[in-house]
Amino acid sequence: MKQYNAIKGKYPGALLLFRVGDFYETFSEDAIKASKVLGITLTKRGNGTASETALAGFPHHSLDTYLPRLVRSGLRVAICDQLEDPKSVKGIVKRGVTELVTPGVSFNDHVLDVSKNNYLAAIHFQKDSLGISFLDISTGEFLTAQGDRHYIDKLLQSFSPSEVLFCKQKKEVFIEYFGDRYNTYALEDWIFAYDFTYDLLIRHFQTTSLKGFGIEEMLEGITSAGAILHYLNETEHKEVAHITRVNRIEEERYVWLDRFTIRNLELVNAQQLEGVPLIEILDHTKTPMGARLLKKWLILPLKELTPIQERLDTVELLVKNKELTTTLVDELKPIGDLERLISKVAARRVNPREMVQLKRSLERLVPIQQLLKQQDQHVLLKLAEQINPCEYLAGRILNMLKEDAPMLTNQGRIIRDGCNAELDELRAIAYTGKDYLLQIQQREIERTGISSLKISYNKVFGYYLEVTNTHKEKVPADWIRKQTLTGAERYITEELKIYEEKILGAEDKINVIEQKMFQDLVLEAESYINPILQNARIVAQIDCLCSFAHAAVANNYCKPIVEDSALINIKAGRHPVIEKQLPLGESYIPNDIYLDDETQQVMIITGPNMAGKSALLRQTALIVLMAQAGSFVPATHATIGTVDKVFTRVGASDNLSKGESTFMVEMNETASILNNLSGRSLVLMDEIGRGTSTYDGISIAWAIVEHLHNHPNFRPKTLFATHYHELNQLTEDLKRVKNFNVSVKEAGNKVIFMRTLKPGGSEHSFGIHVAQMAGMPTSLVLRANEIMGHLEKEHVREGHEDKLKEVPKSTLQMSLFEAADPAWDSIKKILTQTDVNIMSPVEALLKLNELKQLIK
């Protein structure tokens, strides 16, 4: 335990997996944690003594099963292995931590999700600005940015890091700014010193400055990036040659989506368990790199026209040329995770089977490059020029490694025959030598007349001849007895002993030679890190463009016209997610949206609850963002003037942990929108003010619309859904405000939602009808109708609570024969709608009982 305690002391914040023979053991508090997370048995060592210690473990070959569960629970796991062969040493085996796996730092395929990046983030806090960096060590992607707390919060929401680093002294500030929803780890203050982190970066990239990366002036960003490199060293990840550059997240290139918008629009994650995010509709990628890039394209839509148009034009070509798209997709399917494969090469963690997969992936680049070169389209031609098939490396792997190479280097049969003369000779001894043993066995059978004689092997005695007691009198004098059993004797011969040494020695030498040759091949592959990472980026782009083309064809999307204007003109727009969830045979009802900054800047949309106002708002934002991501859109026509910011205030959510009500959260989000407006903003507001009293809500909503319309500097395009019909009056004074309603049709006492957007305001919310549809008791619905009728009759304007007090108590207890009795009117309605010709006797009795209840 002395050795264990010494190693544990170096990693106090991690759960230590301590290799003991064929098991990984945990002790004390670590054992208790492991037992709970993994569901393994907790035992005790030294039970009842002063040195009693909790103990829990699992077989070493089960590491890939248990490690992911530990890491996903938020634990940092230090893996302590035996650094020497126990057979070759006397006393305690030398041990050491070979890897510290954390939620944000792992190469383990069972911890990682192939379709998602696994980001480690670091934040550096300064008074007026924060720096943030993201690293996915499994792919080598390294990003940095800096800005105010709101921008950093947006990036955290967009990139969803698995682990966040910050200075110990800033823990409370971090929680205040970003909450407690992230796995975090606090580092010492000195690690965030600018000079220290700058030096780490230039030493890693072997440069004299960071100007070539465009981050030289980003002091906070540099500090956060350097802190990440320090953390890699601290977690025993020293082989990181695949981290070849650090990229600046260029805020000016991408549409601003605050964290509320990313959440509300469900771009990559659904809010509800059964929900479907947009990415599930658009993701038809065939490679892991493509799946990861597509997510970035959706959370970082472009603002610049040229790259948007290049994507759209390429998607159009792929839509029209189905043969090209089909062929490209077929070539993409066999390609493995080039980013993570070459990252494992750099980290010296790649296995033989993965090297074969790398070779197969590189081989697919040749036909892809040839296909692209045949196209008369500059984007595809440019991509073709950037592909480097690394044919020499692919050939080296092909000629050296067996196609069915095993996972582990010590399993043998990695290297092809003919690559090494000594290896071939040893294999002849090791593998054909066993045939020679059978020849010895047959010769001795014939020599002795012992028909049951056989040659066997065990680790204690090696190869031996076994003779049953029945025939032991026939044993020749030159045989040497090694073991006596109950019913048999075991012998060896000089010839058998010599050949055994040759066979066993050959197998050991084979492993040594194969491992050395494989390690040399891996070192050779390291020189291809940059071109293979470049290939991965090209393949990912091709994959995403093919994915957009597939979605466009499958879902009947149109190519949007994206231009430098203030216009948004969508004809027959549809919600890309909802239309795919409708029952078979039911079609999505499309709607038109027109916004500009001269005639129709603000659309006030009224209509009943459940009519589809919220879906219309979200659908508009999704169409705009899809267009600026380079995708076709669900509409018959769409002209999109580029937006630079998209704001949404939809849905209700409390933040009770911070003592904030639904209304307070709503006001915070609305204030954030109004304080960050621009002339190219798209603003979506749904039911603002519903969390407070009616007149407070109307007043706030009214003032917000006025503010958006009369802003001295900007005219943000706005969709404003509300159930406050009083807002329809705004069009009288605000010329760029227009009223629309989502229409309904009344049939008796039922409401049919038409889900069609029409000009003009609506005067009814039909809330009571919705309550009836939800299954509210009939008596309650009748009472609600009575109260509403009274309020409408009295024309409630002021003293709302006083008027409510004046509403008479339920008149259901009055005389059944009172002519003005509302209950009697309700009974007449029920009887009118009842078809006695199709009622069963039981149904009739139930209906009679319902009527009886109304007059009690």
Swiss-Prot record:
Signal peptide: none annotated. CDD domains: ABC_MutS1. GO terms for biological process: mismatch repair. Gene3D superfamilies: 1.10.1420.10, DNA repair protein MutS, domain I (3.40.1170.10), MutS, connector domain (3.30.420.110), P-loop containing nucleotide triphosphate hydrolases (3.40.50.300). GO terms for cellular component: cytosol. Keywords: ATP-binding, DNA damage, DNA repair, DNA-binding, Nucleotide-binding. It holds the Pfam family MutS_IV. SMART domains: MUTSac, MUTSd. GO terms for molecular function: ATP binding; ATP-dependent DNA damage sensor activity; damaged DNA binding; mismatched DNA binding. The keyword Hydrolase does not apply. ATP binds at residues 607-614. InterPro entries: DNA_mismatch_repair_MutS, DNA_mismatch_repair_MutS-lik_N, DNA_mismatch_repair_MutS/MSH, DNA_mismatch_repair_MutS_C, DNA_mismatch_repair_MutS_clamp, DNA_mismatch_repair_MutS_core, DNA_mismatch_repair_MutS_N, DNA_mismatch_repair_MutS_sf. Belongs to the DNA mismatch repair MutS family. This protein is involved in the repair of mismatches in DNA. It is possible that it carries out the mismatch recognition step. This protein has a weak ATPase activity. This is DNA mismatch repair protein MutS. It comes from Cytophaga hutchinsonii (strain ATCC 33406 / DSM 1761 / CIP 103989 / NBRC 15051 / NCIMB 9469 / D465).
